[in-house]
C-alpha cells in the first residue's frame, strides 16, 4: 500500500490546498479499514457479551456490549471497543450507545478516539429485511464525521451502507460500500462468513473477503484479500 503522502501531491478539494506533509497524519485514517465501519446494533442475544477479532494482517479488536434497560421487545446497551495495530498498540478507542428491537432493527451512536490522530463520531442503523428459521437479511447504513488533531486539516464526512445475509446462523455473506467525498474516495468490500463452532455461551467464526479503495490519489488500486477469526462470548 502506498503512503498517502506519496500519492496526494495535488490535493485541492473545494479550493482548499493542503500541504503534502499533512498526509502522513491522514494515512492511518484513510488506509486503516477497521475504522471505516462503526459498531452496529442488530439481532443478537440480549445479555452481556464480548467479541475478539483477529485479522490476517496482524491487527485485532475487542468489543463489549452491556444491556442496561429495556423489555422483551426493545433493549438499550452500552457498547465499547478497542482496535489494535499489528504491533499491538491501540489504534482506536470506541464508546457509545445502541438500541435493538426484537425484529432485528437497531441503531447506534459511537464516539471513537484515535490516539495521536483525532476523533470520529458515527451513527449507524440496521434494518432487518427478512428473517425466518433458515434465512436472515439485513440492510445497514452509517454516517461518520472525522476531526483530526491538526487544525490545518479540515474535518470530513464518510457515509456508507451494505447488505448482510446469513443462512441458518452458519454461512453468510455481505457487501458494503463507503464514500469519503473530501478525498473523492470510495471503499468497496465483499465478505463471506463461516461459523466453525457454537454453543450456548460462545461462538467462533471465520471471515474472508476482498476490499478495494478507489480514489484519484490511489493510482494503482486493486482488490486486496482480507481474512480473520471472530470469537464471541456471552456471560
Predicted regions and their residues:
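Membrane-embedded beta-strands of outer-membrane beta-barrel proteins
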Residues: 62-64, 95-97, 123-125, 161, ...
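Outer membrane beta-barrel transmembrane domains
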Residues: 149-153, 159-164, 168-219
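Outer-membrane beta-barrel initiation region
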Residues: 28-90, 94, 227
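Outer-envelope beta-barrel architecture signal
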Residues: 46-48, 58-60, 70-76, 91-93, ...
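Outer-membrane beta-barrel "beta-signal"
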Residues: 222-235
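Outer-membrane beta-barrel strand-turn architecture
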Residues: 68-72, 99-103, 115, 129-133, ...
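Transmembrane beta-strands of outer-membrane beta-barrel pores
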Residues: 54-58, 80-86, 101-103, 111-115, ...
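Cleavable N-terminal export/targeting peptides
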Residues: 1-49
Amino acid at each position: 500500500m502506498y503512503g498517502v503522502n506519496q500519492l496526494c501531491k495535488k490535493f485541492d478539494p473545494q479550493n482548499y490546498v493542503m500541504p503534502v506533509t499533512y498526509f502522513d497524519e491522514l494515512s492511518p485514517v484513510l488506509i486503516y479499514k477497521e475504522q471505516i465501519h462503526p459498531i452496529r446494533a442488530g439481532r443478537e442475544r440480549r445479555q452481556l457479551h464480548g467479541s475478539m477479532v483477529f485479522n490476517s494482517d496482524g491487527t485485532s479488536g475487542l468489543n463489549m456490549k452491556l444491556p442496561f434497560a429495556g423489555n422483551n421487545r426493545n433493549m438499550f446497551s452500552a457498547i465499547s471497543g478497542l482496535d489494535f495495530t499489528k504491533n499491538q498498540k491501540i489504534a482506536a478507542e470506541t464508546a457509545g450507545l445502541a438500541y435493538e428491537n426484537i425484529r432485528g432493527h437497531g441503531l447506534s451512536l459511537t464516539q471513537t478516539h484515535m490516539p495521536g490522530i483525532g476523533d470520529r463520531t458515527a451513527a449507524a442503523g440496521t434494518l432487518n429485511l427478512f428473517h425466518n428459521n433458515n434465512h436472515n437479511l439485513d440492510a445497514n447504513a452509517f454516517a461518520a464525521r472525522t476531526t483530526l488533531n491538526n487544525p490545518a486539516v479540515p474535518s470530513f464526512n464518510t457515509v456508507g451502507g451494505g447488505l448482510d445475509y446469513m443462512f441458518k446462523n452458519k454461512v453468510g455473506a455481505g457487501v458494503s460500500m463507503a464514500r469519503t467525498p473530501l478525498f473523492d474516495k470510495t471503499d468497496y468490500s465483499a465478505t463471506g462468513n463461516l461459523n466453525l463452532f457454537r454453543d450456548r455461551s460462545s461462538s467462533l467464526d471465520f471471515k474472508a473477503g476482498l476490499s478495494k479503495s478507489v480514489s484519484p490519489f490511489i493510482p494503482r488500486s486493486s482488490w486486496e484479500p482480507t481474512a480473520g477469526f471472530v470469537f464471541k462470548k456471552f456471560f
